[in-house]
């Protein structure tokens, strides 16, 4: 029994140590902006805008936050890769269209038909070349 308790304590201790070594994705610097903005700040801003624009309910907010987090992280990583390989407007636009289209598809599961229709209409105004 004493061995089991010791093993559990060690396991919990090591798992906490491992988690502490990985910085939160929200504290990571947003590469595209030079003003010190973090990914978390961008997520907060997009979530606030989507909440107002789509009239998200309290039940939809956690799932929407996850969708937005995935999209912002994917965009941030894509910009990092583009900077390393040579970035231009066409590549950046292609990345934005791909990430935003995927975000719209992920949103479909959590939005009502009215909310989704409004989102698709807004998306098609911004990205007419998109295939939603």
Question: Locations of the language-model features?
Answer:
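Charge-rich (acidic/polar
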Residues: 21-132
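Bacterial Sec-dependent N-terminal signal peptides
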Residues: 1-28
């Amino acid at each position: 029994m004493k061995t089991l308790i010791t093993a559990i304590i060690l396991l919990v201790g090591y798992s906490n140590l491992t988690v502490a070594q990985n910085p939160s994705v929200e504290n990571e610097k947003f590469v595209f902006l030079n003003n010190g903005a973090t990914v978390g700040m961008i997520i907060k801003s997009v979530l606030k805008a989507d909440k107002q624009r789509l009239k998200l309910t309290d039940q939809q907010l956690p799932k929407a936050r996850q969708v937005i987090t995935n999209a912002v992280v994917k965009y941030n990583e894509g910009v990092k890769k583009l900077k390393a390989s040579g970035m231009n407007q066409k590549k950046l636009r292609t990345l934005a269209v791909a990430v935003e289209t995927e975000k719209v598809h992920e949103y479909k599961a959590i939005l009502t038909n009215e909310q989704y229709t409004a989102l698709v209409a807004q998306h098609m105004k911004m990205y007419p070349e998109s295939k939603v």
